[in-house]
Amino acid sequence: MPANARSHAVLTTESKVTIRGQTTIPAPVREALKLKPGQDSIHYEILPGGQVFMCRLGDEQEDHTMNAFLRFLDADIQNNPQKTRPFNIQQGKKLVAGMDVNIDDEIGDDE
C-alpha cells in the first residue's frame, strides 16, 4: 500500500483474497464499523487512484419511504389475506409489452 494512503490511518490491517475472490473482514475493521455478522451490509466507493472507501451501510442510507410502504403492504397482507390473489403472468406481460427496460439499470432520483 502506498505510504500516502496511510497518512491519516489510525490503524492498518490486512486480509488475504481467496481464490474465489473473497476475504474475511479483519476484527478491528468489523469493530470500527460496528458490523453485526449476518445483519449488516457494506457500501464500497471506488476512488481515483485505485483506492476504495468502505463503510457500513447504515440506517441513514436506507430508503425510509420505501420501508414504510413495505411495512404497510406487510400489515395489509397480514390483516386482509382474503384480498391477496396470485399474479397473472399473462396480464403482467401485456402491461409491459413494448417497454424497453433493463432491470440492471439504476433508477435515478428523478425517476
Swiss-Prot record:
Residues 12-59 form the SpoVT-AbrB domain. Pfam families: PrlF_antitoxin. One of its GO terms (molecular function) is DNA-binding transcription factor activity. It comes from the Bacteria. Disruption phenotype: Not essential. GO terms for biological process: negative regulation of DNA-templated transcription; regulation of cell growth; regulation of DNA-templated transcription; regulation of growth; single-species biofilm formation. PROSITE patterns: SPOVT_ABRB (PS51740). It is found in: Cytoplasm. GO terms for cellular component: cytoplasm; toxin-antitoxin complex. Coiled coil: none annotated. Gene3D superfamilies: 2.10.260.10. SUPFAM superfamilies: AbrB/MazE/MraZ-like (SSF89447). Keywords: Cytoplasm, DNA-binding, Repressor, Toxin-antitoxin system, Transcription, Transcription regulation. Antitoxin component of a type II toxin-antitoxin (TA) system. Labile antitoxin that binds to the YhaV toxin and neutralizes its ribonuclease activity. Also acts as a transcription factor. The YhaV/PrlF complex binds the prlF-yhaV operon, probably negatively regulating its expression. NCBIfam families: PRK09974.1. Homodimer; forms a complex with YhaV with stoichiometry PrlF(2)-YhaV(4), possibly as a YhaV(2)-PrlF(2)-YhaV(2) complex like the MazFE complex. This complex is seen to dimerize in solution. This is Antitoxin PrlF. It comes from Escherichia coli (strain K12). The lineage of its organism: Bacteria, Pseudomonadati, Pseudomonadota, Gammaproteobacteria, Enterobacterales.
